[in-house]
């Protein structure tokens, strides 16, 4: 028996079947570094339209987690796809470096009593170390960026830029000093930003407290009574007993109806709607003796339960009837609404009682409770209220309460003198900051769209922004305050520029070590130099000012706008929010044109990642076990607009999908063996119909893929590429071409046509996957035939795909119909295989009983119909001639009859043909194979 293997064009490639990504990816990273890929991208980007994705800086503390990986991979997919779309899309990574978590880490290591300058020095060193670790992990993910020149909020230039941004806001009149309740953490010893507050369940003491009447005659008159017949008290309900010592007012809603309720021993004042529930809570019987609107109670005085002072009634529309008594006890130092209401009634800052110190301990001079920590004082306060007969009910409750995101300890609102950016302050020119920011939101694209309403509601309802902190490790607020008046120095903006110049050279230490006389001269004696630092959200929120404005060549000289900010959904109240406020204040618009939000990562059961649950997926472990490309594929395949589920099982599914794409690429590379595009590439009109269809299908798909990338629908890109590999290619085209590819003459039109199509599809495919499978695309690129540059990323979307001409007979609809018929044939072949009536599909001879239209349709392929169906013989016949045992298919107008071929099997092409053995010199071959190895070779037109 002759071995005809040498006469076949068998597939051959050095492209490995086994990906070995954990070992191979680091080699690719090294190669990118050696060829200076990022620099080359910037070079070829010169003159292109610019697309700027501004990096929201991660905090320089701890190892990266799966959420960081998702964020950076999404950004990399975008910048890579924009590069392929013909943009100059730089990516400058950044880090957020100041703030309490780093300072806390340093204090934990070195103690709290070290000198402030040494603390700052150690914070800077610690942040630098953390950045290096995170940087290595981000690079390992395949993220292309300017890693040698990232921006860091602690860089001297950025610290100076932040001071200049603040100066702009001062100049426009947005910054003021005020006494206001702010989120306060005792452990931090500082105010917290809204984004640093999280909510957890907390057990609290809910108490109902009676405040006895002082202005009895006025109260009787308000209710239309001549007098009050019994002792009378107004009742409040609160879950913060520790605020009772600071009570200064009682708030009622002007439009609610209030009732005097006779309970036997005394009369209680309650909201009429809540009388029944309150009496039930107190275990009392009672009768309503009079009612009055809340507005009638204004300024009537009651007595504090245990201090010798009065609490007047103020009208406040924030009072609700959802719980309690309909009356709110007001401690203006410890509540935003309380503070606003008391200020509206003319209470001065000096009149506001603030007995809680920064560490949560009452001042020593507070009667009964001085020197006690507020949470520990709660039982003593409850006991005191009971002692004086003011406690109507005490009941522990579990409720959601604000906590410090770092220490996980409860927070309070605490009125302190702080620096604020005013939301409704009228600036020197233009609208208020709230008006500007709300208008800017309307001009911003949101992906997904619901982000717009979310950010709008946050801006519409937010209070003034407290930008000052009482910490060491932060950018200073370089203000001088007049000792007598408390006013800012009249040359503040000018002085801030002088400070910025020094900070540019020496860092923030330049301010802290500054002798005021150096800038103020003789005036220094009249001014205090303040040592407050800026909220870290002001740090990151002003990066558009110094990063986009030119320090990294990302923007314009004035009013820069990034094309895109991309972060997790929590950043609507974080970086998106602070950047919007600073951009609107300084430039009158948002610093971004579009905001893209991704969801949080959860496990396959929708639970948050937690070490205690054992469901944490660490990106470092995925890199080492499966490879970064698998993680990148998981990210791309997941709809990021909601929660993103990940687990080992889910990642294994991504690995399976990856294998399908890789194997498809490998098959095409193997069949491009010996193909030189410079001399072997055919023009479209020279190619077979099926090959032209495949190229046209790739072009149509490419158009959809480009659109999906532009719309940030990466899961659509993944599904389209995967389906193309599985269905159009793997399930149809690549199966059909094997016979022609392997058996026709090496240089025949039939084979070169097929190889031309494979090259076009491979050139397109490698670009489609490059933004997602960054490492694998680069690997494929190195194995593609023909002259090419060093990296797939140094190119744009493939322009060599050709559309089928208008009016082409075997158009895309035609091949769709052939696919439908082939699927029906395959289904019956599988049934016969299961019944062991047949082996390989080439053992089959199929008769297609068709209606007239379908018979005429399939007849266009002539004898090549058998190649399209991958059977040894295929013929059509009228539907009316179908025997009773013909198989009815799901295709309208088509029945099938499949028989096992009685002919001999060709030893070369494995077709079962009647002419096997008809050639004496090659008794094992069919006539077609003899022609292909000795004669002129077969001619194919269609398939």
From Swiss-Prot:
GO biological process, one term: isoleucyl-tRNA aminoacylation
Main localization, broad class: cytoplasm
Residue span of motif 'HIGH' region: 58-68
Positions annotated to bind ATP: 611
Binding site for Zn(2+): 906, 909, 926, 929
Catalytic activity: tRNA(Ile) + L-isoleucine + ATP = L-isoleucyl-tRNA(Ile) + AMP + diphosphate
A GO CC term assigned to this protein in UniProt: cytosol
Binding positions (L-isoleucyl-5'-AMP): 567
EC id: 6.1.1.5
Cofactor requirements of the protein: Zn(2+)
Locus of motif 'KMSKS' region: 608-612
Co-factor remark: Binds 1 zinc ion per subunit.
Compartment(s) where it occurs, according to its Swiss-Prot or TrEMBL record: Cytoplasm
Keywords annotated in UniProt: Aminoacyl-tRNA synthetase, ATP-binding, Cytoplasm, Ligase, Metal-binding, Nucleotide-binding, Protein biosynthesis, Zinc
GO MF entries: aminoacyl-tRNA deacylase activity; ATP binding; isoleucine-tRNA ligase activity; tRNA binding; zinc ion binding
Annotated PANTHER family: ISOLEUCINE--TRNA LIGASE, MITOCHONDRIAL, SOLEUCYL-TRNA SYNTHETASE
Assembly, per entry: Monomer.
Homology family: Belongs to the class-I aminoacyl-tRNA synthetase family. IleS type 1 subfamily.
Stated role: Catalyzes the attachment of isoleucine to tRNA(Ile). As IleRS can inadvertently accommodate and process structurally similar amino acids such as valine, to avoid such errors it has two additional distinct tRNA(Ile)-dependent editing activities. One activity is designated as 'pretransfer' editing and involves the hydrolysis of activated Val-AMP. The other activity is designated 'posttransfer' editing and involves deacylation of mischarged Val-tRNA(Ile).
HAMAP family: Ile_tRNA_synth_type1 (MF_02002)
Name of the protein: Isoleucine--tRNA ligase
Originating organism: Ectopseudomonas mendocina (strain ymp)
Name of the encoding gene: ileS
């Amino acid at each position: 028996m002759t071995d005809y293997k040498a006469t076949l064009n068998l597939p051959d490639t050095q492209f490995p079947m086994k990906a070995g990504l954990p070992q191979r990816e680091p080699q690719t990273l090294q190669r990118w570094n050696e060829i200076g890929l990022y620099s080359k991208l910037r070079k070829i980007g010169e003159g292109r339209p610019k697309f700027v994705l501004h990096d929201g800086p991660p905090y320089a503390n701890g190892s990266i987690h799966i959420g960081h990986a998702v964020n950076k991979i999404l950004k990399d997919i975008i910048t890579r796809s924009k590069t392929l779309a013909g943009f100059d899309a730089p990516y400058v990574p950044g880090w957020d470096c100041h703030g309490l978590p780093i300072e806390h880490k340093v204090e934990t290591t070195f103690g709290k009593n070290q000198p402030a300058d040494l603390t700052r020095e150690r914070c800077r060193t610690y942040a630098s170390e953390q950045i290096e670790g995170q940087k290595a992990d981000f690079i390992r993910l395949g993220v292309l960026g300017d890693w040698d020149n990232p921006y860091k909020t602690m860089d001297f230039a950025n610290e100076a830029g932040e001071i200049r941004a603040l100066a702009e806001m001062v100049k426009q009149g947005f910054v003021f000093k005020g006494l206001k309740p702010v989120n306060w953490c005792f452990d931090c010893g500082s105010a917290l930003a809204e984004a640093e507050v999280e909510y957890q369940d907390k057990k609290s003491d809910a108490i109902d407290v009676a405040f006895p009447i002082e202005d009895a005659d006025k109260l009787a008159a308000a209710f239309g009574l001549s007098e009050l017949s019994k002792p009378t008290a107004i009742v409040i309900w609160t879950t913060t007993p520790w605020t009772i010592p600071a009570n200064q007012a009682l708030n009622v809603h002007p439009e609610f109806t209030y009732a005097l309720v006779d309970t036997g021993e005394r009369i209680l004042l309650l909201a009429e709607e809540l009388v029944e529930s309150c009496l039930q809570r107190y275990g009392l019987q009672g009768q309503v003796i009079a009612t009055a609107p809340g507005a009638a109670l204004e300024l009537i005085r009651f007595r504090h339960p245990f201090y010798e002072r009065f609490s007047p009634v103020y009208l406040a529309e924030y009072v609700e009837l959802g719980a309690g008594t309909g009356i709110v006890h007001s401690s203006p130092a410890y509540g935003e609404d309380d503070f606003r209401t008391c200020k509206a009634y003319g209470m001065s800052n000096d009149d506001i009682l603030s007995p809680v110190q920064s560490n949560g301990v009452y001042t020593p001079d507070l009667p009964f409770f001085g020197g006690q920590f507020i949470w520990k004082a709660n039982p003593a306060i409850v006991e005191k209220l009971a002692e004086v007969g003011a406690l109507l009910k005490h009941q522990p409750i579990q409720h959601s309460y604000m906590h410090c995101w770092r220490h996980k300890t409860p927070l309070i609102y605490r009125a302190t003198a702080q620096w604020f950016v005013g939301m409704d302050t009228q600036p020197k020119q233009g609208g208020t900051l709230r008006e500007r920011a709300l208008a800017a939101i309307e001009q911003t694209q949101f992906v997904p769209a619901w982000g717009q309403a979310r950010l709008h509601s946050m801006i519409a309802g937010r209070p003034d922004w407290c930008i000052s902190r009482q910490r060491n490790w932060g950018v200073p607020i370089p203000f001088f305050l007049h000792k007598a008046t408390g006013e800012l120095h009249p040359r503040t903006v000018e002085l801030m520029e002088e400070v910025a110049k020094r900070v540019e050279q020496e860092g923030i230490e330049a301010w802290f070590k500054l002798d005021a006389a150096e800038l103020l001269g003789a005036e220094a004696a009249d001014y205090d130099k303040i040592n407050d630092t800026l909220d870290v959200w002001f740090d990151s929120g002003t990066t558009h000012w110094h990063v986009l404005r030119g320090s990294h060549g990302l923007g314009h000289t004035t009013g820069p706008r990034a094309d895109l900010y991309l972060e997790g959904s929590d950043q609507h109240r974080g970086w998106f929010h602070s950047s919007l406020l600073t951009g609107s204040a300084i430039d009158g618009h948002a610093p971004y044109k579009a905001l893209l939000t991704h969801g949080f990562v959860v496990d396959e059961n929708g639970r948050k990642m937690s070490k205690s649950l054992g469901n944490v997926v660490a990106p470092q472990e995925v890199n080492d076990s499966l490879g970064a490309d698998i993680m990148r594929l998981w990210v791309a395949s997941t709809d990021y607009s909601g929660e993103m589920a990940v687990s080992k099982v889910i990642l294994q599914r991504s690995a399976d999908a990856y294998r399908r794409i890789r194997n498809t690429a490998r098959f095409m590379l193997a069949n491009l063996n010996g193909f030189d595009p410079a001399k072997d590439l055919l023009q479209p009109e020279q190619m077979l119909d099926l090959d032209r269809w495949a190229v046209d299908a790739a072009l149509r798909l490419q158009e959809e893929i480009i659109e999906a990338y532009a719309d940030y629908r990466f899961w659509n890109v993944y599904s389209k590429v995967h389906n193309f590999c599985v269905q159009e290619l793997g399930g149809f085209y690549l199966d059909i071409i094997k016979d022609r590819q392997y058996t026709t003459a090496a240089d025949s039109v039939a084979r070169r046509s097929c190889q031309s199509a494979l090259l076009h599809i491979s050139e397109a495919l490698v670009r489609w996957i490059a933004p997602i499978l960054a490492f694998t695309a680069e690997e494929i690129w190195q194995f593609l035939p023909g002259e090419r540059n060093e990296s797939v990323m140094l190119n744009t979307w493939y322009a060599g795909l050709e559309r089928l001409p208008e009016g082409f007979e075997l158009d895309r609809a035609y091949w769709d119909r052939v696919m439908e018929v082939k699927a029906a044939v395959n289904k019956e072949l599988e049934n016969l295989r299961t019944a062991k009536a047949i082996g390989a599909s080439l053992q089959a001879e199929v008769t297609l009983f068709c209606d007239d239209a379908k018979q005429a349709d399939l007849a266009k392929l002539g004898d090549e119909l058998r190649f399209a169906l991958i059977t040894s013989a295929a013929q059509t016949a009228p539907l009316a001639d179908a025997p009773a045992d013909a198989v009815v298919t799901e295709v309208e107008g088509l029945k099938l009859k499949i028989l096992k071929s009685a002919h001999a099997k060709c030893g070369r092409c494995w077709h079962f043909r009647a002419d096997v053995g008809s050639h004496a010199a090659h008794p094992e071959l069919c006539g077609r194979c003899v022609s292909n190895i000795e004669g002129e070779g077969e001619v194919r037109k269609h398939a």
